[in-house]
């Protein structure tokens, strides 16, 4: 009886084992999909998982390669170096008749670029469309492919694969690029124009994230143990889940209470015939309208603003675009009582389409319901505030011709006041190692041609360790890819002055006296690291920023400067990048700077010198085109710096091709 039971058990075990083998699948990472681009000129790793000991065959370009999966089920085949070309088919298959194969079609071989960092990499083609309308309308190149890594985090350790994504090796056209990185799109376009080979653009970024999130634990363990100690709090999954749920519920209840307590909703303050004569008249540039009458501090809650505009018969009924600059931090906007748009966070430009028939001859009313979650509701200066008509109404470069400018005067009434809104999550993406673990590590060893790193805004509050972090990032990523020659182009922070953002009146005020600038400190750290690394270049964009907008629109020019860096690093083109100081000496009453290239001659601004006390003073400077002479009457000058401001609008050292010189600080040699 016992023998019979044992035989039955063995039989069931064998059957289950057979089913397991029959159901087993060979897998490849989600980065491997039809339409992918693989790197020319290097061995091409193809890898994945299978049953331990299973033979996996990879077929590509009329050749077949075999490998046996290890004890952990991992397998890898390195395809030989290939020239650019395609399309090809990549097939991956396990052993056995029942093994399901993987067939990937339309595979190209060309150049693959990884772009990583924070929100300025994220800025989409949709956002910059008004800056480059004609060029974006013409986007169409099936040999440029776009891949967007889905955001994810992991506090415990590295992952083998990424999450599914909606932009997975899509061919470049306006529709596919609309929600894709503008820098990535323009970089692919530029590099294709230079090389005429397929381009693969992998974007792996997350807005607002610090560099520490992109570093592996091993790189932090020795020098920054406090960061890993901080991470340990978030390794408690039960805490993270409970806190996230509590925060989400609190934010949801806050929004519900806000709406229920706002008299403007039930009172229909957006209605065209609503009587606003008793409301207070305010200028959008006078921040007094945003102050609470009870606390005297910026309002948390809602503020309603109404502006009456006159529309003549020629424009009545026509479709238009309402440009409301940028508002902090949320808004719901109405025209003649109809909602025409809303934006639920502070950064996007407000561009709302007005349908045909909504504008009427005579008086029209624009109503804005400001929602301020954290205090400081305001308009951003130096942005367009207008109604635009005509076929060019989508464009800001050049500006549309047929417009009705909005006035700066509004009627204002306080809606409701609230306590500050609780956060909706605990932002695991801002914790050390979490992005390296979840979205960077799984990409290796996918063969790359180069990396673009565009980040730093979130580290500007504490720039001191940034240079070390950046060196560790480049070193650890090169180790991960087993390629110590992997090229990096670091995009330096653009000029930006957050002090001006909080509703200052236009025009922007210039910083003219020497200041301590964390922004410049971080820019200088980026400059210093790039200078010291023979496989890195710096894209200087200190002339492409916007004083009050941390997300400037000129992303095509950013991509072009990144491309110049790669031309020098990879293709050995002797292109000139931004001017660099290669020597300095103290002459009679001046400091003489020798540069690596000629520059535009004339009077120069942005230089400061300091003596023994370390206090900086403005210094006049000029150039004859080959050297810079900085005037110095100081007896014991010790150091010199350039463009040391958040927004150094007057700094004007440029190459003959117009590229700006980087922020720098040097000790003066006597």
Task: Give the residues covered by each predicted segment.
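Short, basic, low-complexity termini and linkers enriched in Ser/Thr/Gly/Pro
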Residues: 3, 13-17, 95-100, 629-639
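Ser/Thr-rich low-complexity repeats and stalk/linker segments
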Residues: 25, 31-108, 374-376
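Surface beta-strand/loop "capping" patches
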Residues: 30, 39-42, 296-300, 321, ...
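Aromatic-lined ligand-binding clefts that engage carbohydrates, nucleic acids, or primary amines
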Residues: 47, 279, 309-337, 366-368
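Beta-strand-rich ligand-recognition modules
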Residues: 62-85, 97, 333-386
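C-terminal beta-sandwich/jelly-roll accessory domains of carbohydrate-active enzymes
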Residues: 64, 592, 596-670
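An acidic-aromatic loop/edge-strand motif
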Residues: 102-171, 202-288, 363-446
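Catalytic cores of secreted or luminal carbohydrate-active enzymes
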Residues: 245-284, 522-585, 600-602
């Amino acid at each position: 009886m016992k023998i019979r039971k044992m035989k039955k058990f063995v039989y069931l075990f064998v059957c289950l084992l057979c089913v397991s083998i029959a159901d087993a699948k060979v897998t490849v990472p989600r980065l491997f999909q039809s339409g992918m681009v693989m790197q020319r000129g290097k061995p091409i790793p193809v890898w994945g998982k299978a049953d331990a000991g299973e033979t996996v065959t990879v077929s590509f370009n009329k050749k077949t390669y075999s490998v046996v999966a290890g004890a952990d089920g991992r397998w890898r085949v390195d395809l030989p170096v290939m020239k650019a070309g395609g399309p090809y088919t990549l097939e991956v298959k396990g052993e056995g008749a029942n093994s399901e194969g993987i067939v990937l079609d339309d595979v190209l071989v060309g150049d693959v670029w990884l772009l990583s960092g924070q929100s300025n990499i994220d800025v989409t083609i949709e956002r910059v469309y008004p800056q480059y309308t004609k060029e974006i309308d013409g986007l169409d190149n099936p040999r440029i492919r776009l891949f967007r890594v889905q955001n994810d985090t992991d506090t415990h350790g590295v992952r083998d694969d990424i999450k599914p994504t909606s932009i997975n090796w899509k061919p470049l056209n306006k529709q596919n690029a609309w929600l894709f990185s503008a820098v990535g799109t323009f970089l692919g376009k530029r590099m294709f124009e230079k090389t005429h080979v397929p381009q693969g653009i992998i974007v792996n970024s997350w807005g607002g994230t610090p560099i520490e999130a992109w570093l592996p634990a091993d790189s932090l363990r020795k020098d920054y143990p406090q960061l890993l100690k901080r991470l340990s709090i978030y390794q408690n999954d039960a805490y993270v889940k409970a806190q996230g749920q509590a925060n989400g519920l609190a934010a949801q209840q806050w929004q519900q209470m806000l709406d229920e307590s706002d008299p403007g909703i039930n009172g229909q303050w957006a209605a065209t015939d609503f009587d606003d004569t008793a409301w207070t008249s305010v200028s959008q540039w006078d921040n007094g309208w945003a102050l609470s009458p009870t606390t005297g501090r910026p309002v948390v809650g809602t503020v309603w603003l109404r502006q009456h505009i006159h529309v003549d018969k020629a424009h009545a009924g026509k479709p238009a675009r309402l440009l409301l600059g940028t508002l902090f931090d949320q808004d719901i906007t109405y025209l003649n009582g109809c909602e025409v748009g809303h934006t639920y966070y502070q950064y996007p430009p407000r561009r709302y389409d007005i349908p045909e028939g909504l504008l009427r001859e005579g008086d029209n009313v624009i109503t804005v319901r400001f929602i301020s979650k954290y205090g400081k509701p305001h308009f951003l200066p130096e942005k367009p505030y207008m109604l635009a008509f005509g076929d060019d109404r989508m464009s800001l470069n050049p500006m549309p011709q047929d417009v009705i400018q909005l006035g700066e005067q509004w009627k204002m009434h306080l809606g409701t006041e609230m306590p500050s809104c609780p956060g909706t999550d605990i932002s695991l993406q801002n914790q050390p190692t979490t992005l390296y673990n979840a979205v960077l590590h799984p990409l290796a060893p996918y063969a790359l041609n180069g990396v673009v790193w565009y980040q730093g805004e979130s580290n500007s509050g504490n720039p001191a360790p940034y240079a070390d972090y950046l060196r560790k990032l480049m070193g650890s990523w090169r180790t991960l890819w087993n390629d110590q020659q992997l090229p990096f182009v670091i995009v330096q922070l653009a000029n930006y002055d957050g002090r001006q953002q909080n509703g200052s009146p236009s025009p922007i005020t210039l910083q003219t006296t020497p200041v301590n600038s964390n922004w410049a400190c971080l820019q200088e750290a980026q400059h210093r690291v790039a200078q010291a690394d023979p496989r890195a270049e710096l894209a200087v964009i200190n002339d492409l920023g916007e004083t009050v907008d941390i997300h400037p629109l000129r992303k095509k020019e950013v991509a072009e400067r990144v491309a110049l860096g790669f031309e020098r690093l990879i293709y050995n083109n002797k292109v000139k990048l931004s001017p660099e100081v290669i020597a300095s000496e103290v002459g009679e009453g001046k400091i003489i700077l020798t540069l690596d290239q000629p520059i535009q001659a004339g009077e120069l601004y942005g230089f400061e010198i300091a003596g023994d006390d370390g206090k900086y003073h403005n210094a006049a400077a000029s150039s004859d085109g080959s050297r810079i002479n900085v005037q110095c009457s100081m007896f014991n000058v010790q150091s010199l710096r350039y463009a040391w401001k958040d927004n150094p609008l007057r700094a004007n050292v440029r190459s003959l091709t117009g590229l700006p010189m980087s922020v720098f600080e040097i000790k003066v040699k006597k």
